[in-house]
Structures are given as structure tokens and as C-alpha cells.
A protein has these predicted regions:
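Soluble N-terminal domains of membrane-associated systems
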Residues: 1-100
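Generic secondary-structure signature for well-ordered alpha-helical cores
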Residues: 19, 23, 40-44, 93, ...
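Interfacial loop-to-helix junctions that mark the boundaries of transmembrane helices
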Residues: 73-76, 138-143, 194-199, 259-260
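Alpha-helical transmembrane segments and their cytosolic membrane-interface
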Residues: 77-131, 135-144, 234-243, 254
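C-terminal ends of transmembrane helices
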Residues: 108-112, 155-166, 214-226
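Core alpha-helical transmembrane segments of integral membrane proteins
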Residues: 116-190
Length: 260
């Protein structure tokens, strides 16, 4: 049986763990269960309240209610990584099943965090291929598929660069959607494709914030209504930003490109 860890050290670890889970794209209930599992193993009670930009974590000694710590942390904007979510969730079970000490748990956590959330090169190629495949699925011709593949390559690279520069997420969506839709428009204007509506409509599909939307539904279903509604509104704003970028492309063209 491991010695009960110091509450300050444990709270620091749980705050870092929660930050990693939320920024990787986890819904609220899963974060709460994993953090609660770890805290209970070390003999502490924990309460986590998650919002869109911040979260609050309170850790209390289950045998001495006067011993407690409360942190408010900002949630950094990170890449969605299902692999990291899975690894962090597995770590919480490993701590419980194998009885890891807090030092061992911190070492395992650092090992998970040392691995890149997503490999840029492989993500770039796979996302570009997937977006081009969607274009073909929706009836795009060969020219549209090529245009969308190239547009996605450029758009994903641009979005990655803007994120590295710390540009506001909404601005990222406006600029990226404008660039990818404009590349698709160039394909139409130069006669590379004859399915203009599919080309321009498909160009921004890779930007859809699907994970955020799904998480908002899960949060509402799990009675985390406040954060669920907040995430849904934030997702709607991002979709609106995408529409603004496409609108900027279509406005100066003075042509009815979308046959709808």
C-alpha cells in the first residue's frame, strides 16, 4: 500500500491531468470519471467543474475536510487527439489496477504527454485525401477532386501555422475557409472542374468542428447542460466563421457558382 500523497502535489498533478484531457477534446463526464478514479485511489475526494475556457478543480481529504485545495485553470487550445485521450484514460485505470504511486503516475503521464498529439505530415495527407474523397462522394468530377485535395493541403497547413502563431480560433476559421474556397473557385474559373457547387461546398468540410459538436451533445445528455450549451454556441460561431470565409470568396466573383 502506497503512502498517502501530499494534497498539494496531488492537486497539481490532477490539474495538469485535467488540462491535458480537456484540451485533447474529451467530453466533461469522461474527464470527471477519470479524475475521480485517480483521486479516490489516493484517498481524496475531488470535484471538477468545466467551462469552455476555464475549469475549477477542488481536492479534499476524505478523512479531514479541513484539508483541501481549489484551483482555477485556463484551458489551452490544443489539437484533438483520440490517441492521447485513450492513453490518459488508460492511465487512470492503470493507477487503480496496478496501485501506482503518485511519482510513478506522474512519470507515466509525462511519457504520454511527450508523444506528439498528432503527426503533422501524416495528418496533412490523410485529411487531404479524406476531403477529396468526400468531394467525389458528393458528385464532384476529377477536376474537383484534384482542386479539393490541393486546397485542403494548403488550408490545413495554413490553419496549423496560424494556430502555432496564437491567432484567434475564429480568425483562423475565417482565413482558412476563405483560402480553401478561393482555391476551389480558381479551379472553377480556369475550367478545371464543371461541378462548381460540389467543389466549393466540399472545400471547407475538413474544418467542421464535429468533435466540439458531439461533445456538446454528450455534455447535455450527461446533465452538464451549461457547458454543453456553451460548447454548442461556440461551435455554431465557428461554423458561421466558415460561412463568412466562403462568402468573401463568392462576393467578388459576381457569378452564381453554387447551383442551388
Amino acid at each position: 500500500m502506497n503512502a498517502k500523497p501530499d494534497i498539494q502535489i496531488l492537486t497539481n498533478f490532477l490539474a495538469e491531468y485535467t488540462t491535458a484531457m480537456v484540451s485533447a477534446g474529451t467530453y466533461t463526464a469522461r474527464v470527471e470519471k477519470c479524475v475521480d478514479r485517480i483521486a479516490n485511489h489516493y484517498g481524496y475526494d475531488v470535484s471538477v467543474t468545466i467551462f469552455v475556457k476555464y475549469f475549477t478543480i477542488s481536492v479534499m481529504d476524505s478523512q479531514d475536510n479541513s484539508l483541501r485545495r481549489t484551483y482555477v485553470r485556463k484551458i489551452p487550445l490544443g489539437q484533438v487527439s483520440f490517441n492521447r485521450i485513450s492513453e490518459l484514460s488508460s492511465l487512470s485505470w492503470q493507477i487503480l489496477d496496478e496501485g501506482l504511486s503518485l511519482d510513478e503516475a506522474k512519470e507515466s503521464f509525462e511519457g504520454v504527454m511527450s508523444v506528439s498529439a498528432n503527426k503533422f505530415a501524416s495528418s496533412l495527407i490523410l485529411i487531404s485525401l479524406a476531403n477529396a474523397a468526400f468531394c467525389r462522394l458528393f458528385g464532384g468530377d476529377a477536376g474537383s477532386v484534384v482542386c479539393i485535395f490541393f486546397a485542403t493541403l494548403v488550408g490545413y497547413t495554413l490553419k496549423f501555422a496560424l494556430a502555432k502563431m496564437g491567432v484567434n480560433l475564429k480568425v483562423q476559421y475565417v482565413l482558412t475557409s476563405f483560402v480553401v474556397s478561393f482555391i476551389a473557385y480558381l479551379g472553377v474559373s480556369y475550367g478545371l472542374t464543371h461541378t462548381s457547387d460540389v467543389a466549393i461546398g466540399s472545400s471547407v468540410l475538413f474544418m467542421m468542428p464535429g468533435v466540439f459538436l458531439i461533445n456538446s451533445v454528450f455534455d447535455i445528455l450527461n446533465d452538464n447542460t451549461l457547458v454543453g450549451i456553451s460548447r454548442a454556441i461556440s461551435t455554431g460561431i465557428l461554423i458561421l466563421c466558415m460561412a463568412v470565409g466562403v462568402y468573401i470568396t463568392l462576393t467578388p466573383s459576381s457569378a452564381e457558382l453554387l447551383n442551388v
